[in-house]
């Protein structure tokens, strides 16, 4: 009987050790983003002028783009004029692509439509608190204009040998090149860099 009691006690200890404790962090499992909810989020955070294009199979990517340990999001969206609602919805419009070439004032460049195939914008929400990018009051909101891409995905880039790699938005152009869009923590601005030419 004593042997059976010891076995049960040992089994209980093993089960307790395998179950997550209240004070231990549990890795978050990826939750798929529903398109209907995503459209509601875009409307609430950026206004009615933005819509999610139907042809994009992956219009949303998530990662910690600003390095604060909270999940952020980048959403592909369309808008004929992203500037007017920036005041009411408190988002910043940036043009990291043209800034790379020395001309990145979005008040002027947001009207550039040189390539009709690349007219989409990237909406970026920096997450805040437990709800991360789904928070009603996120840490920051941005509309990135004029970045040429056919699709986007999460990438990583090493800026310094002394620091771990950062998460970036990889902008992929099927017939031209890949590029990286990343948040410069020191200068508090978005940057664009060309990558490898697609063969």
Identify what each model region corresponds to.
Residues 18-199:
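Beta-propeller-forming repeat regions
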Residues 5-15:
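Bacterial N-terminal signal peptides
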């Amino acid at each position: 009987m004593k042997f059976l009691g010891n076995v049960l006690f040992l089994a209980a200890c093993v089960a307790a050790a395998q179950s997550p404790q209240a004070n231990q962090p549990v890795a978050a499992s990826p939750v798929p983003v529903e398109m209907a909810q995503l459209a509601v989020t875009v409307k609430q955070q950026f206004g009615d002028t933005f819509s999610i294009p139907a042809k994009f199979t992956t219009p949303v990517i998530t990662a910690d783009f600003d390095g604060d340990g909270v999940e952020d999001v980048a959403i592909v969206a369309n808008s004929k004029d992203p500037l007017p609602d920036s005041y009411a919805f408190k988002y910043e419009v940036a043009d990291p692509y043209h800034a790379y070439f020395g001309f990145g004032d979005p008040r002027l460049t947001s009207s550039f439509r040189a390539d009709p195939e690349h007219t989409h914008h990237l909406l970026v929400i920096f997450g805040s608190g437990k709800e991360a990018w789904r928070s009603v009051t996120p840490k920051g909101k941005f509309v990135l204009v004029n970045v040429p891409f056919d699709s986007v995905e999460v990438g990583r880039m090493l800026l310094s040998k002394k620091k771990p790699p950062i998460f970036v938005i990889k902008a992929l152009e099927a017939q031209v090149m890949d590029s990286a869009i990343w948040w410069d923590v020191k200068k508090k601005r978005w940057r664009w860099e060309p990558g490898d030419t697609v063969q």
